[in-house]
Amino acid sequence: MTAAPHTAPRAVCLLGPTASGKTAAALALAERWPVEIISMDSALVYRDMDIGTAKPSRAEQAIAPHHLIDIIDPLDAYSAAQFATDAQALIEAIRARGRLPLIVGGTMLYYKALTQGLSDLPGADPAIRAEIDAEAARDGWPALHAKLAQVDPVTAARLHATDAQRIQRALELYRLTGQPMSALLAREAGAAAFHRHEAAAAYLSIALEPADRAVLHARIAQRFDAMLAGGLLDEVEALRRRGDLSPVLPSIRCVGYRQAWAYLDGEIDMATLREQGIAATRQLCKRQITWLRSTPERRVVDCLAPDYVDQVARLVRNALETP
C-alpha cells in the first residue's frame, strides 16, 4: 500500500495559558524558521495597553514580523469572528511570501473561531420573542413547554416546564427555521467534529501546559508584581485621563486593568488590587487550561520542562519536513 503523501500544516498554533512561556518559545522558533507571528490574544489588539497585557517589546517584535497587535483603540471592540477573518487572510498572505504563519496566544474562543467556525444558529428575533412572551403571559410557561414538546420532544424533555429563557429560545428557533433546536444543535455538533478533523490536518497545534500548576501560579504572582513595578498604574491612569473609557468596555475589563481602575477609583487598596489581580489571572489560566483539554488535536508540551522550547521546535520540524 502506498503511504499517504506528507502534507505540511498551513500554520503552526502555539497555545497555552497565561505565563506559560509562549512568547519565548515563539521567538525561539523565529530564530530557526522564517516565521511571521499572528497574535491570538484578545488583549494585545489594543493600543496604549502594553504593561498589563505583557505585550511583546519592540525589540521582541523586531525579531519577526508580528500581526494583530496594536490594531484598535481601547474604545473599540474586536470579535472572535473578526479575528478568524483577519487570521485567515494573514495566513494566506504569509504563505504567499514563502514564510511560516505562527499563531501565538491563549484566547481559545479565537482559536475555535479560526479552526471550527462559530455558531450558525439564527440570532434573536425581537418580534417572535414578543409573540412568545405574549403567549406565556396569557397561557403560562408550562403551556408553552407543552407546545415545545409537540415539535421538539428531545429539547422539551431536558427543560423544566418553567425554564422561560430556554423554552423561549427553543420555540424561537423552531419558528425561525421550521426545525427543532435538538436537530440544529446535533448538526452543529457534527460540523464541529468535521472542522476539528480538518483542523488537525491544516494546523499543527502545540499546547504549553504545566505539569505542576502551583509553579505556574507562582509565575503569575511574580508576573503581576513585575507589572505593578513596571508602571501598570501609570498606564491605567493615562487611559482614565482620556475621559471616554470606562470599566464596562472589553478593553478595561481585561485582567489587571479592571482591578487597577478600581484602585484608582478608591474602591480597593493596593493589597486588594494585588490579591484580586493575581486571583483573576489564575482564574483566566484555569479557563484556558480547561479549553485546551477539550482540544483533542493539540500536541502537549510541559511548559515547565527545561527543554520545552526544544520540544516545541522538534514538533514543528517533524511537521514541516517531508519524511
From Swiss-Prot:
Needed cofactors: Mg(2+)
Catalytic activity: adenosine(37) in tRNA + dimethylallyl diphosphate = N(6)-dimethylallyladenosine(37) in tRNA + diphosphate
Feature type site, description Interaction with substrate tRNA: 107, 129
Alphabetical list of Pfam families matching this protein: IPPT
UniProt key word tRNA processing: yes
Binding site for ATP: 16-23
Keyword Coiled coil on entry: no
Binding positions (substrate): 18-23
Cross-referenced InterPro entries: Dimethylallyltransferase, IPT, P-loop_NTPase
Keyword list, A-Z: ATP-binding, Magnesium, Nucleotide-binding, Transferase, tRNA processing
BP GO terms, sorted: tRNA modification
Region (Interaction with substrate tRNA): 41-44, 165-169, 253-258, 286-293
Enzyme Commission code(s) on record: 2.5.1.75
GO molecular function, one term: ATP binding
Domain of life: Bacteria
Family: Belongs to the IPP transferase family.
Complex and partners: Monomer.
Protein task: Catalyzes the transfer of a dimethylallyl group onto the adenine at position 37 in tRNAs that read codons beginning with uridine, leading to the formation of N6-(dimethylallyl)adenosine (i(6)A).
HAMAP family with a match to the protein in the record: IPP_trans
Protein name: tRNA dimethylallyltransferase
